[in-house]
């Protein structure tokens, strides 16, 4: 459908990954379905591609996506997180982010509700690409109805709305567990009635979610 495809990433993945890859989050899952290669931002691709997929990194939002055009006929930006998250960047980085998504041949967004927003920012082509999860490698034998406890889906930031999730969980008489994401705040460990898990790969996290009676994740998607 798209010909040869490469995903550019902050990770050090090079080449293709298979369906049992332990950290098969959304972008990796889609790369598997497209039989795409991976190339770190710090390296030069080994050849030319029909399509280059860029998820603008949170740690470097002012990167120039046009720099990838020397290796790719088309460049697409893949949305990560809610469409408003870039407004937490510095003013200069916010304008650079807008410039990047306008320069992309198209934007892949999560939901139909995101399409109007990105078009309103001046993007010339916006398409919905749903979140994809691959079941390979998941242990279905551990799932049962005999469970207890609540698992929260994110930390105490505007991105994950962890406080909203916690307040809902706190109204139920069940032990509360939360995940440790990259944006976890140090003060979260001081909350007495939350047990925190260590940082996990995607597959470890999905397996862990299956151990609890209730999951609460109030992350805003618009």
Spell out what each predicted region is.
Residues 76-91:
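A short, histidine- and acid-enriched strand-loop-helix "catalytic/donor-clamping" loop
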Residues 209-222:
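Acidic donor-binding loop of glycosyltransferase active sites
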Residues 35-38, 49-53, 72-75, 104, ...:
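Active-site regions of enzymes building and remodeling cell-envelope glycoconjugates
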Residues 18-21, 134-205:
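Conserved catalytic-core segment of nucleotide-activated headgroup transferases in glycan assembly
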Residues 1-74, 105, 117:
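N-terminal pre-catalytic "stem/leader" segment of glycosyltransferase-like enzymes
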Residues 89-107:
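Membrane-proximal helix-turn-helix segments that form the acceptor-binding/catalytic region
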Residues 42, 57-60, 110-115, 179-188:
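Short, polar loop motifs at secondary-structure junctions
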Residues 105-116, 123-139:
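Donor nucleotide-sugar binding/catalytic pocket of nucleotide-sugar-dependent glycosyltransferases
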């Amino acid at each position: 459908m798209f010909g040869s495809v490469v995903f550019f990433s902050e990770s050090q993945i090079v080449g293709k990954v298979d369906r049992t890859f332990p950290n098969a989050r959304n972008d990796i899952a889609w790369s598997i379905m497209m039989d795409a290669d991976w190339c770190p931002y710090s390296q030069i691709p080994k050849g030319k591609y029909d399509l280059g997929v860029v998820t603008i990194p949170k740690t470097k939002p002012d990167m120039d996506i046009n720099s990838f055009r020397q290796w790719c006929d088309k460049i697409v930006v893949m949305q990560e997180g809610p469409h408003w998250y870039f407004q937490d960047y510095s003013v200069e980085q916010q304008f650079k982010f807008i410039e990047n998504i306008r320069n992309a041949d198209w934007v892949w967004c999560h939901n139909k509700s995101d399409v109007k927003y990105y078009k309103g920012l001046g993007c010339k082509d916006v398409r919905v690409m749903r979140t994809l999860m691959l079941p390979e490698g998941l242990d279905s034998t551990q799932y049962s109805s005999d469970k207890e406890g609540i698992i929260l889906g994110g930390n105490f930031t505007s991105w994950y709305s962890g406080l909203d999730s916690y307040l809902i969980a706190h109204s139920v008489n069940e032990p509360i567990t939360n995940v440790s994401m990259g944006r976890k705040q140090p003060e979260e460990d001081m909350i007495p009635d939350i047990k925190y898990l260590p940082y996990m790969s995607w597959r470890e996290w999905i397996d862990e979610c299956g151990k609890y009676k209730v999951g609460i994740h109030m992350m805003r998607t618009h």
